[in-house]
Regions:
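Conserved ABC ATPase signature
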Residues: 136-140
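ABC transporter nucleotide-binding domain
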Residues: 180-274
């Protein structure tokens, strides 16, 4: 049975356990029709497990997930007909041409023969690969391969497109070009896009709303702008040389007026303060008193990185994503064995 089609994705108390370990813990969220939704979380938070459930590759232990109103467990075939899934690792065959790859995808998705050529032409034009369609993929750049990957997920005109780390490993110029294509695809097809990323700028640029997951639980869901505004603080970042007075330094900082929260990540401290200029001289006074050497200090307005740190306690580090996905998949295999 179809549910409320105002929501392209709905989960209700979604849970997935492997033995004694709970990877996804009672997640309830709703993604509006036509929305670009970002799903963010640190290593091992449950992002990959959640996507595998939503794309019917893994069954939940309990709870429910609906895609376009269809249950991922009882209506898996209908769910697959309504989704496109572009994985982090490229899936194109590098010894086929771009067009041959899309022809293969069209056949796998059972697209009517009389519609295939027109559909491929439209997609190639949209992602600006028409002039490269007859070249073998082995000659493509990383950005071109990713565009072709995304094109393969669009051929059957899904209502929901899942993009798992779509720009990981690409340089910043290529990443921004992919962002433009994602926006273009969204505007052209009016589809819902569910995006995982560890690039905060990417989430800020693309997403209508984001959800932050940590330890298998949803911590917050809101628009990037609202999340930044809700911080209500300036951000003081400190890098210091750790020594025997480290704990005393942290304890003294917590007593400073206007300091509302402190996150520690190794030798880096992030302070959320309601009056940064008033706090900074006190930080230097305490560090001098305790003989703590500060190597760097900065005062900024809140960014999405700061929001993430506030809810999870640490940053998403560039380059961790690919390792984390392999680790999370390996953990799932081990626990199912």
């Amino acid at each position: 049975m179809r549910s409320n089609v105002l929501y392209s994705i709905e989960t209700k108390s979604l849970t997935k356990s492997f033995g004694d370990e709970t990877a996804v813990n009672d997640i309830s969220l709703s993604v509006k029709d036509g929305e670009i939704f970002g799903f963010l979380g640190p290593n091992g938070a449950g992002k990959s497990t959640t996507i595998m459930i939503l794309t019917t590759l893994l069954k939940p232990t309990s709870g429910q997930a609906l895609i376009s109103g269809f249950d991922v467990t009882t209506n898996a075939k209908l769910v697959r007909q309504n989704i496109g899934y572009v994985q982090q690792e490229t899936t194109v065959d590098e010894y086929l041409t771009g067009r041959e790859n899309l022809l293969l995808q069209a056949k796998l998705n059972h697209i009517q023969k009389d519609k295939i050529d027109k559909r491929i032409d439209e997609i190639l034009t949209l992602i600006e690969l028409t002039d490269k369609q007859d070249k073998t993929v082995v000659t493509y750049s990383g950005g071109m391969r990713k565009r072709l990957d995304i094109a393969g997920g669009l051929l059957h005109r899904p209502k929901v497109l899942f993009l798992d780390e779509p720009t990981v490993g690409l340089d910043i110029q290529t990443r921004r070009k992919i962002w433009q294509y994602i926006k273009k695809i969204h505007d052209e097809f009016k589809m819902t896009i569910f995006l995982t990323t560890h690039y905060m700028e990417e989430a800020d640029q693309l997403c209508d709303r984001i959800g932050i997951i940590d330890d298998g639980k949803i911590q917050v869901i809101d628009s990037p702008e609202n999340l930044k505004k809700a911080m209500g603080n300036e951000v003081i970042s400190i890098i210091f040389e750790e020594g025997e007075n480290r704990d005393s330094f942290l304890s003294e900082l917590e007593k400073i007026e206007f300091v509302n929260k402190i996150n520690k990540d190794g030798s880096k401290l992030t302070l959320f303060a309601s009056n940064g200029p008033e706090v900074i001289p006190k930080i230097f006074y305490i560090s001098s008193k305790l003989n703590i050497k500060i190597t760097s200090i900065s005062l900024t307005q809140p960014t999405l990185d700061d929001v993430f740190i506030s809810y999870t306690g640490h940053e998403i580090r560039d380059g961790d994503s690919k390792f984390n996905q392999k680790r999370e998949h390996a953990k799932m295999k081990r626990l199912r064995a």
